[in-house]
Amino acid sequence: MEDIRTILDRIDYLVEAKETYVQAKLPYSRTDLAPVKSKETLDYHYGTLHKAYVDKANAGEGGDFQKAGAFLHNLYFPQFKKPGGANNPTGSSLELVERVHGSYDSFKEEFTNIAMGIQGSGWAYMDTKGSIKTIANHKVVNNIALLVD
C-alpha cells in the first residue's frame, strides 16, 4: 500500500487537472491481481466502465457523475499491487490506521461492514484523518486516503 503522502499528492494533482481527464495507467498487468480481481473484472471495470467515465467527462456528457467516476477510478486502480506477502499498509498509512482504529484487523472489519452497507452505486474510503466515509453515487471529494469501490 502506498504511503499516505504519495496518495495525497496524487489527489492534489488530479483535482488541479480536473478539466481534462486521462485514464490512469495500470501499474500492473490485468492478470497480476488474481485471485482477488480477475482479468475479466479488470477488463470490465477498468477497460469498459472507467474508460467510459473518462470519455464522457471529456465530452461534457453526464456532468458531475461522469467527472467523479473518472476522478475516483483514477485513485482506485493505481493503489493496487500484485499480491505477495502480507500486502498490508506500512509507514504513515499504518500509523494512521492504528491510531484511529486500534489495529489493521479492526479497521478491515469496520471498513468492510461500512462498504457492504452501501446501497447501489457508491464508494467507501478512509479520509486523511483516518475516518471511514462513504460517497453515495459519485461525487468528487479531495480528502481520500484509501478508496474501495
Q: Where are the language model's segments positioned?
A:
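Feature for soluble, non-membrane regions of globular proteins
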Residues: 17-149
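Charge-dense, intrinsically disordered terminal/linker segments
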Residues: 1-20
